[in-house]
Each structure stands twice: as structure tokens, then as C-alpha cells.
């Protein structure tokens, strides 16, 4: 569970987030909804520790991210999976190599076990036959699924997605929505998604909108 308590963030005197409080539950698909410029990217950057709020607390199962030292923050980030806007795959790597990248960086398992885990993740997103291909050789939807496989490769406790449907057609967007939602439930992750797509709210938002702050809504 992630608890956001009364966070405020300003830039050059302009308040972007003002006294935001909400809770993101385990096993739920939690949505941060807003138009461009509403503050949703700033909010998620604060939640994952890339920015520090001016005031407030961000608690991960009771642990305050804001007061963590560098080592504690690095350990917490190893529990996070990230799905960026676009796919953010490495063009010079195959799909399999992209999925194995975080495993090679952080996993202490043997090479055989790391590859087995990557193969499992690709199978989970229905890309078993695409591991040898490069990003330039697959569709946008397949790249997004490959990015999801990479994001879950380390079996994260928390999954953060920034506009996961960006650039996708409606049919593919629905498939990506369903995949993220199913994986969230399957692994009991705390998933937080930035989106301006109200179709995603209807497709995968687990709970009603519980907080409204100016142009920013949190569905959790």
C-alpha cells in the first residue's frame, strides 16, 4: 500500500500539487487522471522519489520515502517496475535482451535462471515468439507488451505506468489495459497509472474517483 499524505509541490512560486492525500491499494489498478499540465506527471515523480514534495509524506507500507537515505531509496526502487510513455526499449537490443536487462543489472540468480524468468515474462504477455526480434521489427502494441514484460521481470511490488496507451489504437489500448489489470491482480501489485484517457478509467479503474483537486483526479 502507498499512502500519500498532504503533499504540496511548487515550482518558482507556482503551486502544481496542493495538499494531495490519497491511498493506492495493493492488488488494485489506481489511476491518476488529468489533462496535460494538470500535475499528474509531477505527482508520480514525487511518489517514486524522482522529486521531493515541499510538504507531506509518502508512505510505502508505513515507510516514509521522503526520509529514506540513498541506500534505502535504492532498495525501494528495486521493488518498483516502470512503464514509461512510449516503450523506452533499447533499439540495439532484442526483445529478449531488453527484458533481461534489469535482471542482468540487479538479479543474483544464475544466467540460466535469469533467462528462464525473462522467457516466463515474455510468455505472460504473449510474446514468446518475438524474443529474437528487435524493437524496429515489431508493432507498437508488441513493443508496449515487451516493456510490460521488462517492468515485471524483477517481480516488483509496485508498478508505475506513465500514459501506457500513448500512440496506440483503441483496440490495442484495451488489450494493454486488460493486461496491466490482470497482472496487477495476479501478482497483487500496487499499480499506479497516469492517464488522460477516460476509456482506461472505464476499462480498468478498480474503484470510484475519491479525490478531486482542481484538474487532477485520483481513482483509487
Give the ranges of each region predicted by the language model:
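Catalytic Walker B motif of ABC-type/P-loop ATPase nucleotide-binding domains
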Residues: 159-162
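Short coil-to-helix segment of the ABC ATPase nucleotide-binding domain corresponding to the Q-loop/switch region
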Residues: 93-101
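A short, proline-enriched helix->beta-strand linker immediately N-terminal to the Walker B motif
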Residues: 153-157
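Helix N-cap at the start of a conserved alpha-helix in ABC-type nucleotide-binding domains
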Residues: 170-172
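Conserved ABC transporter NBD signature motif
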Residues: 56-64
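Conserved ABC ATPase signature
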Residues: 134-138, 142
Amino acid at each position: 500500500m502507498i499512502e500519500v499524505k498532504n503533499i504540496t509541490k511548487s515550482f518558482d512560486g507556482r503551486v502544481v500539487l496542493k495538499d494531495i492525500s490519497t491511498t493506492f491499494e495493493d492488488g488494485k489498478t489506481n489511476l491518476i487522471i488529468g489533462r496535460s499540465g494538470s500535475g499528474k506527471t509531477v505527482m508520480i515523480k514525487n511518489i517514486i522519489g524522482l522529486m521531493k514534495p515541499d510538504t507531506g509524506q509518502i508512505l510505502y507500507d508505513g515507510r516514509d520515502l521522503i526520509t529514506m537515505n540513498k541506500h534505502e531509496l535504492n532498495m525501494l526502487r528495486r521493488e518498483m517496475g516502470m512503464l514509461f510513455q512510449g516503450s523506452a526499449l533499447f533499439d540495439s537490443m532484442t526483445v529478449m535482451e531488453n527484458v533481461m536487462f534489469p535482471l542482468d543489472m540487479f538479479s543474483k540468480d544464475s544466467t540460466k535462471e535469469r533467462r528462464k524468468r525473462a522467457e516466463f515474462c515474455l510468455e505472460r504477455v504473449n510474446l514468446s515468439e518475438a524474443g529474437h526480434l528487435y524493437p524496429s521489427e515489431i508493432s507498437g502494441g508488441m513493443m508496449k507488451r515487451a516493456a510490460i514484460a521488462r517492468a515485471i521481470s524483477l517481480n516488483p511490488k509496485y508498478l508505475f505506468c506513465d500514459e501506457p496507451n500513448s500512440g496506440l489504437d483503441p483496440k490495442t489500448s484495451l488489450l494493454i489495459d486488460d493486461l496491466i489489470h490482470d497482472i496487477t491482480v495476479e501478482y497483487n501489485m500496487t499499480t499506479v497509472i497516469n492517464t488522460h484517457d477516460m476509456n482506461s478509467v472505464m476499462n480498468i479503474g478498480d474503484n470510484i474517483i475519491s479525490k478531486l483537486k482542481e484538474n487532477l483526479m485520483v481513482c483509487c
